[in-house]
Amino acid sequence: MKLKLKFLLISLLGSSLLLSACSSAATQVISSLSSAQKYFESSQGELNKKNVIKILKEGYESDANKAVHALLAGWKYTLMDQQLLSKEVDSRFIKAFGSGRDKGDVTPSVSEKGLYLNETYTGFSSQIAKVLGVQSQTVKQFNYKWSSNSDFKVQIQISMKGKVGSDSESQQLIKSFLSSDNNGSNQNGGVKETDFNGDSANFDGFFTFTYTPPTQSRKFGATSFDPLTTKINFPADLQIDVSTTHQKLNTLMEANEQVKQIKSRKFTGKTFDLLPFFYYALL
């Protein structure tokens, strides 16, 4: 398949990840994203997900660190350099992430799924997402360090612009959060519904997603490259920390028992599919 490259990624990767002289074609491919692009451009293989997984797996078995660095570079490039979360869903997105998917399915994202709201607010997670009223989101930072599958850290910061109570359903939820308890006392730090009227409903939020080695036995390895499910499974524990520029929201995150749960949460035993990000970078 003859492909026209839309971008070059050499500048993305440090010199330690650039193409090195070695006998294995697979290792050469995964040495950098740009070399993977060149591999498919030269018609050495059809660009499809199974072939990408096959090549990356062979590369991992030859040089694990370079393969993982290429995967993480693809994740970073697609999220931060391409600003995937700021774009409309198009044919390129669908090819990489699948039909029926949207930006809420991207890892990470400020969305009901991306924030795992159902695990914290079971039964009303969709309303919580509406309370946040996400208007836009931008990846501001993406830093990673990888030494081994038991020693790594990926940290991604997303800034978002939101509007508290952007619809009637979320306004009702806010009202229930701010209502007095059975004893007639208010435990919201003095925050009232009127604190979110008009322009006061607008705020900037900052969500930091930190991925660290899984505390369970599963770790990233050759079996993580799965051509049957067309996934590259990346096991990790995840911590999500939230802050905002809205003084009253920050007060609620300290004082209100429901709202404070979103401020800092940790999830164990999660698995994240990194293939769509690498594949998106190649399209």
Swiss-Prot record:
Lipidation (S-diacylglycerol cysteine): 22
Record-linked PROSITE patterns: PROKAR_LIPOPROTEIN (PS51257)
Subcellular locations according to the entry: Cell membrane
Keywords for this protein: Cell membrane, Lipoprotein, Membrane, Palmitate, Signal
N-palmitoyl cysteine lipid attachment residues: 22
Alphabetized InterPro entries for the sequence: Lipoprotein_3 (IPR001595)
Leader sequence residues: 1-21
A Pfam family the protein falls into: Lipoprotein_3
Superkingdom of origin organism: Bacteria
Bilayer disposition of the protein: Lipid-anchor
Main localization, broad class: membrane
GO cellular component: plasma membrane
Protein family according to the UniProt entry: Belongs to the MG439/MG440 family.
Entry protein name: Uncharacterized lipoprotein MG439 homolog 2
Lineage summary: Bacteria, Bacillati, Mycoplasmatota, Mycoplasmoidales, Mycoplasmoidaceae
